[in-house]
Amino acid sequence: MNKPLASIGLDADNFWSYKRTHGDADWVERPSYLPVLTERMITSFSKHQIKPSVFVVGADAAAADGPDFVQALTEYGCEIGSHSYEHDPWLHLYSPQELRDELKRTEDALQAAGAPKPRGFRAPGFAMSPDLMRALVELDYDYDCSVLATWIGPVARQYYLRTNKTLTKSEREDRKALFGSLWDAGLPNKPFTWKAPCCEVDGRTLPAVQLTEVPVTVFPMARVPIHASYVIYLSGYSVPVAKAYIKAALAFCKATGTQPSLLLHPLDLLDGSDAPGLEFFPGMNMPLGKKQEMLDFILEAFAKQYRLVNLAEHAESIKGIPVRERGIDVLSRGREVNPAAPKN
């Protein structure tokens, strides 16, 4: 009997992008851990015989160590997706033209680094908008995977804003939709289709939207995250509880017919010695060996129940199958744009 499929994707957020989101001024120096990350990723992927999608930031692909990173993953067999050019978690504030320019600039950087034209996109910080979905369709993307259908994003944002006292008023305004909207909890937890009719904007006729969405899977019904960073952080308090949590999440996925999409991050494979200054990030005080053990458990648990594929294959698998549809206008809820809000 064939196993149902599940997909795995890693958002290749670099050292500087974490510092930028946190508001650290020295992010402009663009510190990078890509050489170390490359080795850790391929070692882990090889161990578990998986070839995930890796969503790469365009500015990193264009940096000195970017081509080696992209080429190593491409040669290994990973799908390379787009994660925007500047990793702005306030991408929803961009105008339609700025979004097209950002996406095209990223495509050019990824292809110059040795990857094919990206087929899929994940927004940094789950910063979605109706204009973003239209831009993805205009540029012929096959799928998006930016939805995290949870209520916990606004809670995490409030904690982040309360504990980060150094942010300016402008920086706080930029981050007011960080980690998504409360309304996102009402979006499907299974793949669905974004839809919208054609329309005219600034004298341009924009095509109708029909775009596959593969959400980052959350715990069915409870709608809390299950991606690796959360489970690894939980294991810092109790390994048995973390293992029970992931087992329960997979049991609920099976019961609800959810073919999950698991999100990984670089910091799942790194510790504080690899990225000094990121101690604020949950789990960065854990020894690398402990993190690797928990990640191994997560990947093994998924592999026992599912055939692990990349996001492109997951998106392709639902073509021709009736799925839910959502209008792109729902992405405006909780992400109201302030035209005066500056972008850094």
Language model features by range: what are they?
Residues A25-S32, F55-A59, H87-L99, P118-R119, ...:
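The substrate-binding groove and active-site-proximal loops of carbohydrate-active enzymes
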Residues L91, V155-Y160, I226-H227, G272-F280, ...:
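Histidine/acidic-residue-rich catalytic or RNA/ligand-binding cores of hydrolases
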Residues M41-I50, Y76, A109-P116, V201-Q210, ...:
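A structural motif corresponding to the C-terminal end of an alpha-helix
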Residues D11, F45, I80-H83, T106, ...:
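Conserved, mostly hydrophobic/aromatic
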Residues M1-Y76:
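Active-site beta->alpha N-cap acidic-glycine motif
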Residues A115-P116, A123-G257, K343:
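Active-site-adjacent pocket scaffolds in enzyme catalytic domains
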Residues H48-L132, Y141-R157, V209, V218-P220:
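Metal-dependent polysaccharide deacetylase catalytic core of the NodB/CE4 family, i.e.
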Residues K47-Q49, Y233-N344:
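C-terminal domain-boundary segment and adjacent tail
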